[in-house]
């Protein structure tokens, strides 16, 4: 981990990066950023619209630029898109940006968590399971390559995942955050 106090959440769609990221940020009293949401704010359109008009390459260009911008901030929890690790320059950037945490989940869990979400352009296919398996085969080694910490989100509650990351972060970043533990319990146990 670098001297910055950022926490970067990586992993496949449906791993819980946004949900866990918000609760982790609240527990650590840090601002939360979601790179996909920041892209949507900046462009004024949703991710599927960007894919429709610019293709995946256009979206990945926007994503790389947004990650560069967000990594200039210090003391944030950042949820990245599932494909952010596809470009070598993004992997290098994220590794240098802070503590990289791989939120690992199974394809079965991904399917359950994303079944009704039409905001996932890569899953708009006849066989979402096959697509998720293909993405996992390609991306899992890339997530592992840059992760300092890997947490399985299949077996633990949101609360336990947040506690595990918080504990690791505090042990390795003692001077960067307040040590007041009075309000570090996340809400819900999802």
From Swiss-Prot:
Residues annotated as binding substrate: 36, 60, 82, 139
Q: Which GO terms describe its cellular component?
A: cytosol
Pathway as given in its UniProt record: Metabolic intermediate biosynthesis; chorismate biosynthesis; chorismate from D-erythrose 4-phosphate and phosphoenolpyruvate: step 5/7
Q: Does the keyword Flavoprotein apply?
A: no
| Primary subcellular site in the record, as a coarse category | cytoplasm
Q: Where in the cell is it found?
A: Cytoplasm
Keywords, alphabetical: Amino-acid biosynthesis, Aromatic amino acid biosynthesis, ATP-binding, Cytoplasm, Kinase, Magnesium, Metal-binding, Nucleotide-binding, Transferase
Q: Specify the domain of life of the species encoding this protein.
A: Bacteria
Molecular function (GO) terms for this protein are: ATP binding; magnesium ion binding; shikimate kinase activity
Under CDD domains, the record lists: SK
Which processes are annotated in GO (biological process)?
Answer: amino acid biosynthetic process; aromatic amino acid family biosynthetic process; chorismate biosynthetic process
What top-level class of enzyme does the UniProt entry assign?
A: transferase
* Cofactor(s) of this protein: Mg(2+)
Binding-site residues, ATP: 14-19, 120
Name of a matching Pfam family: SKI
Under catalytic activity, the entry for this protein gives: shikimate + ATP = 3-phosphoshikimate + ADP + H(+)
Q: Where, by residue number, does Mg(2+) bind?
A: 18
- Entries under InterPro entries matching the protein: P-loop_NTPase, Shikimate/glucono_kinase, Shikimate_kinase/TSH1, Shikimate_kinase_CS
Q: How is the cofactor bound?
A: Binds 1 Mg(2+) ion per subunit.
Enzyme Commission no: 2.7.1.71
Q: Which family does it belong to?
A: Belongs to the shikimate kinase family.
Listed under subunit, the entry gives: Monomer.
PANTHER family, per this entry?
A: SHIKIMATE KINASE, SHIKIMATE KINASE 1, CHLOROPLASTIC
Which purpose does this protein serve, as stated in its record?
A: Catalyzes the specific phosphorylation of the 3-hydroxyl group of shikimic acid using ATP as a cosubstrate.
Name of the featured protein: Shikimate kinase
Gene that encodes the chain: aroK
């Amino acid at each position: 981990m670098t001297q910055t106090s950022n926490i970067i959440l990586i992993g496949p769609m449906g791993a819980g990066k946004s949900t866990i990221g918000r609760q982790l940020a609240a527990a650590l009293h840090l601002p939360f950023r979601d790179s996909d949401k920041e892209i949507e704010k900046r462009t004024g359109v949703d991710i599927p619209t960007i894919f429709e008009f610019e293709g995946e390459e256009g979206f990945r260009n926007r994503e790389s630029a947004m990650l560069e911008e967000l990594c200039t901030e210090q003391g944030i929890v950042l949820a990245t898109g599932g494909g952010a690790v596809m470009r070598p320059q993004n992997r290098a950037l994220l590794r240098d940006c802070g503590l990289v945490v791989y939120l690992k989940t199974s394809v079965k869990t991904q399917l359950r968590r994303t079944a009704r979400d039409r905001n996932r352009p890569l899953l708009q296919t006849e066989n979402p399971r096959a697509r998720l398996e293909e993405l996992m085969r390609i991306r899992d080694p890339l997530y592992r390559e840059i992760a300092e910490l890997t947490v399985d989100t299949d077996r633990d509650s949101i609360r336990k995942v947040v506690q595990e990351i918080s504990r690791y972060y505090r042990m390795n970043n003692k001077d960067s955050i307040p040590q007041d533990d009075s309000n570090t319990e996340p809400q819900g146990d999802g």
